[in-house]
Each structure stands twice: as C-alpha cells, then as structure tokens.
Amino acid sequence: MKCGKIKADIMDDGGTNMKIYVHTAEKKENGWYFLCEASLQGLQAKRHMLVDSDACAFAYILEAADAFVYVIMPKEVWGAIKEALRTNEPVFLVGNDATIELEGIHEEVAYLIENIAGNANYGEEMEQAVTAFFE
C-alpha cells in the first residue's frame, strides 16, 4: 500500500462524515497555521485524532452538530507537526470563514507516534513512514 497524495480540499465520504485536507502549513509568531479551502463554520475541536493509513496521514476530528469532520494531515505537513510538538506551539486550522485551534493535538500526535512504532496494525507503509519521520 502506497501513501496517497492530496486530491481535494473537501471530500464527502457519502455518509455523514466529511474530510478536509490541509494543503499548507505556515509558521507565524503565535503558532502554526494549517490552511484548507473549506468552511469551518459551526465546527468545534474534539481533542481526538485517528490515523488514515490508506492516505498515510493523521486525522484530527472536528465536531459538527450531527457529524464528524476529519482534518486530514498528509506527509507534506508532518514537518510542521514535528516542529509544533518540539516547541509546544499551538496549531490552528484556517478555513475560508473561520479559524479553529486544534486543541490537544500535541498529546494526540505524541500518543499516535508512540503507538504506531513497531505496530503492524497501522499498515507497514504508515508504520515505516511515521517511524522514519518522527525519530
């Protein structure tokens, strides 16, 4: 299984959940800003993350009134995640109409990195990519 590339900023999975793709990360004076081209109106940080092994990406969960929205963070922004972990700087998601602080991202990513190392349940490609990048 190969790690996938970003194909769109917003993808509806056909059910009640959507995926928003981070396409760029920028460092500013007060933290990291992950940019996407999506509406963030009415969404709130859930303080929980998952892994999208098929896309070789981390996924931060946002809550809407009746669904979850997955913020997909592909390998292209892992450098920003690694630096935010190192410096403990806040991470914000910037959309077309709102900015949301991704609360708890440091603890969640640190947990995932530790859990993925040597764990074949995440898929060999994901395990190798995370281990190599975050060592």
From Swiss-Prot:
Pfam families attached to this UniProt entry: UPF0738 (PF19785)
Family: Belongs to the UPF0738 family.
InterPro entries named in the record: UPF0738 (IPR020908)
Domain of life according to the entry: Bacteria
UniProt-recorded name of the protein: UPF0738 protein Aflv_2116
HAMAP family linked: UPF0738
